[in-house]
């Protein structure tokens, strides 16, 4: 890993420990990313409870849109009780020019929740990078996929003021 890239640490915590340990983890790391999963589960509830910023990826499919709508109900209920929780929806695996992607984009823009202007397209480089144990920026730094990630990260830094 290049010394120019930030150090990344990965760990897995059971749902019951996530809320309790979140503050201690935040003290140790500048940025903490919690993958809460794609379904409304105990772990997803715990991840929302431990978070102060949510990135909610949404794939352009009926099943994913329905699941995201259910998840947003949980998120918005939590946001109503707290003033330290923010977030945004990120279109993921978007395919330009397809009717399903266009319908999905239109639908999420109608929801009462912020949507990132940048999106992640459906590029093979994302999957290949994972197979290599790398980020797409490491794997193919000049690829369209890497450009997508970099644009999204710049927007995220601005939104979160990191």
Question: Predicted regions span which residues?
Answer:
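Short histidine/acidic/glycine/proline-rich micro-motifs that form metal-
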Residues: 61-62, 92-96
């Amino acid at each position: 890993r290049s010394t120019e890239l930030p150090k990344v640490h990965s760990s897995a915590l059971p749902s019951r420990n996530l809320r309790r340990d979140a503050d201690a983890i935040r003290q140790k790391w500048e940025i903490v990313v919690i993958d809460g999963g794609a379904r409304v589960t105990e772990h997803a509830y715990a991840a929302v409870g431990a978070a102060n910023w949510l990135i909610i990826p949404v794939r352009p499919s009926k099943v994913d849109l329905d699941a995201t709508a259910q998840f947003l109900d949980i998120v918005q209920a939590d946001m109503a009780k707290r003033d330290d929780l923010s977030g945004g929806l990120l279109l993921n695996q978007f395919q330009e020019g397809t009717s399903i992607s266009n319908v999905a984009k239109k639908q999420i823009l109608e929801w009462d929740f912020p949507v990132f202007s940048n999106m992640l397209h459906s590029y093979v480089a994302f999957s290949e990078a994972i197979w290599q144990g790398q980020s797409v920026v490491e794997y193919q730094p000049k690829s369209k996929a890497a450009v997508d990630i970099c644009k999204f990260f710049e927007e995220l830094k601005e939104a979160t003021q990191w």
